[in-house]
Regions:
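Short phosphate-binding loop-to-helix
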Residues: 110-124
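Charged phosphate-binding loop/patch that engages nucleotide di/tri-phosphates or the phosphate backbone
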Residues: 180-191
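Non-DNA-binding regulatory cores of transcription-related proteins
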Residues: 125-133, 138-160
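Domain-level recognition of soluble alpha/beta enzyme cores
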Residues: 151-182
Length: 191
């Protein structure tokens, strides 16, 4: 006859509560950084701001959105650069995760932004949102991700996605060096 160790019910309840608090702690915010998808350089007459997505970029967005949802990703707010390629990426991503594209916020400061502008944009996220996604451009989005999580991502590729957990209750408490990097994914990453 086998021996079964008795585990006190209280210990199981505490362990379950601890596991739940890590995932759903109300004093945590989740920040996603999405670099715009691959853009087209076919029309040399277009200004940088107007460049559309390339066909590869259009194909990559649903793949990344599916991976995002497959990991249980949810976003309550999407803020993007007003550049055509960033807006198009945000809209395609939103459609693929059933986020209302009308709720996407265009922020001009995310075009040619630096870390401080990304930080400012994140600090103004609506308090009702526990998660937010910033859609922008390199090199700023990579620099911002590295500054937030004290990590060393060499380059967030086009349509690359970074997920970070922030130990804050209010978005205006966001600061560099305080995030935990949870995920770094991109289209060519083997799954």
């Amino acid at each position: 006859m086998g021996y079964k160790a008795a585990i006190p019910v209280e210990a199981v309840e505490i362990a379950n509560l601890f596991a739940w608090s890590i995932v759903f702690h109300p004093l945590m915010k989740t920040l996603y950084l999405l670099r715009h998808a691959k853009s087209s350089w076919d029309d040399s007459e277009l200004k940088d701001f107007e460049r559309p997505l390339a066909s590869r970029g259009i194909d990559d967005v649903p793949v990344m959105a599916a991976r995002f949802q497959g990991r249980g990703g949810q976003v309550a707010c999407i803020i993007c650069s007003p550049a055509n390629r960033a807006k198009s990426t945000a809209k395609l991503f939103a459609k693929n995760i059933e986020f209302d594209v009308e709720d996407i916020i265009s922020n001009p400061e995310l075009y040619f932004a630096g870390t401080q502008m990304f930080l400012k944009a994140a600090s103004h996220v609506d308090e009702t949102c526990d998660s937010a996604m910033l859609v922008g451009h390199n090199p700023a989005i990579t620099e911002f991700g590295n500054a937030m999580a004290n990590c060393d991502i060499d380059n967030i590729p086009t349509c690359g996605l970074v997920e970070m957990r922030l130990p804050i209750e209010h978005w205006n408490d966001i600061d560099t060096g305080t995030a935990d990097l949870l995920e770094f994914d991109y289209p060519k990453k083997s799954t």
